Design a protein with these regions (language model features):
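Short terminal or interdomain "cap/linker" segment that borders an active site or interface and mediates
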Residues: 1-5, 120-152
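Short linear motifs at secondary-structure transitions and domain/linker junctions
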Residues: 15-17, 82, 118
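Short, structured coil/loop segments at alpha-helix boundaries
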Residues: 15, 44-47, 120-121
């Protein structure tokens, strides 16, 4: 299944190399971007589970996940992590619409960093394409757990 998704999104060696460049560019901005994201989530009172207590833990987990995503070789550790994330979002009854909207907010902030970088327009285009592909994979896998049946 995942191979077909990669093929459909045309994730190749160039995309993976671009993801590492993207990681180097975005990582210094994760703190600020994630801080602003959770401030927005709290302001909109999207979930009762996003309390002041939970925020610090969520920020740290989000930074680790973002970094892991762009460095991912898409091995079992990544798949297990994204399944846990999706299941947790489902278990706290986070609507898929808020999951997608939230990821869009993050994506737009990441794109702002790309746009403001010193890279050439061609490289910026490649970085945005890579960002889109990696976020599509991440969202698709997380959201697929919403319908998954868990058997103990």
């Amino acid at each position: 299944m995942i191979g077909k998704l990669f093929e459909f999104l045309e994730v190749d060696a160039e995309t993976r190399a671009s993801a590492l460049v993207l990681s180097d560019l975005l990582t210094p901005h994760f703190e600020d971007i994630i801080e602003r994201f959770y401030s927005k989530v709290q302001a909109f009172d999207i979930s009762p589970h996003v309390t002041d207590q939970a925020i610090e833990m969520l920020k740290q987990k989000h930074k680790r996940h973002s970094s892991a995503l762009f460095h991912s070789q898409f091995q079992e550790e990544y798949f297990a992590s994204i399944r846990r994330i999706g299941i947790r979002h489902r278990d706290v009854a986070l609507s898929p619409k808020w999951y997608v909207a939230g990821y869009m907010k993050l994506k737009l902030a990441f794109i702002e960093v790309i746009i403001r970088s010193d890279y050439s327009i061609v490289t910026k285009g490649q970085l945005v394409k890579t960002l889109e592909k990696y976020i599509a994979i991440d969202m698709a896998l997380a959201l697929s757990t919403y319908d998954a049946v868990i058997v103990d």
